[in-house]
Design a protein with these regions (language model features):
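Hydrophobic anchor at the beta1->P-loop junction of P-loop NTPases
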Residues: 8
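P-loop (Walker A) phosphate-binding loop of NTP-binding proteins
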Residues: 11
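Conserved glycine(s) of the Walker
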Residues: 15
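Conserved substrate/cofactor phosphate-moiety recognition/catalytic segment
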Residues: 24-65
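Glycine-rich phosphate-binding loop used to anchor ATP phosphates in small-molecule kinases
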Residues: 59-112
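A glycine- and Lys/Arg-enriched "phosphate-lid" helix/loop adjacent to the NTP-binding pocket
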Residues: 98-164
């Protein structure tokens, strides 16, 4: 059985992790977002915002972690595996910062492809900032555009998840995947 790899993408505070947690509670296999853990590990070493202080180091760690998750999904015996963000997010955020990075980043993104990409657009009603999520809502709108550009650059079609309750958004995802069969 080929496992379908499905990425939920979007800027900060768009509801991705909430949906991943809801999908997990319904029995779906989900790969969690790892950027918060990388940030927390750096903070324990005295680096407040590794992404801002050394975006390339942060992004290398993130790319490696997401690549590991992607490869791990190949051994999962489930029809669907959901990812909280995908590999091209790394490139999108570096482009947002106008930061250079090795061509190998794009090579990895081209090599490991997802079957479906769902995008959650910025939604001011649910937007929150915290110690790891420092971007303003206006910055989230800009990041969203970089994400769209990055994924399209790698040949993806994006499926917009409409605003709604968590259950409505989950239903939309599951119904879309059922129609795609």
């Amino acid at each position: 059985m080929k496992t379908q790899k499905i990425a939920l993408i979007g800027g900060p505070s768009t509801g991705k992790t909430t949906l991943i947690n809801a999908l997990k509670s319904k029995g779906y296999y989900c790969m969690e977002e790892i950027s918060r853990q990388i940030t927390l590990d750096a903070q324990e070493k005295g680096i407040d915002q590794l992404f801002l202080e050394d975006p390339l180091l942060f992004s290398k760690q993130l790319l490696l972690g997401r690549q590991t998750q992607f490869l791990e999904a190949d051994s999962i015996n489930d029809k669907l595996v959901f990812f909280d963000r995908g590999l091209p997010d790394v490139v999108a955020y570096l482009d947002y910062l106008n930061s250079s990075y090795p061509e190998s980043f794009k090579t990895i993104c081209r090599k490991h492809t997802y079957d479906v990409i769902f995008i959650l657009k910025p939604w001011e009603a649910i937007y929150e900032q915290d110690n790891e999520r420092y971007e303003t809502f206006e910055q989230a709108l800009i990041i969203n555009n970089f994400l769209i550009h990055s994924y399209k650059e790698f040949g993806y079609s994006l499926v917009d998840i409409p605003f709604g309750t968590v259950q409505e958004r989950i239903d939309f995802i599951i119904n879309h995947l059922a129609e795609k069969k």
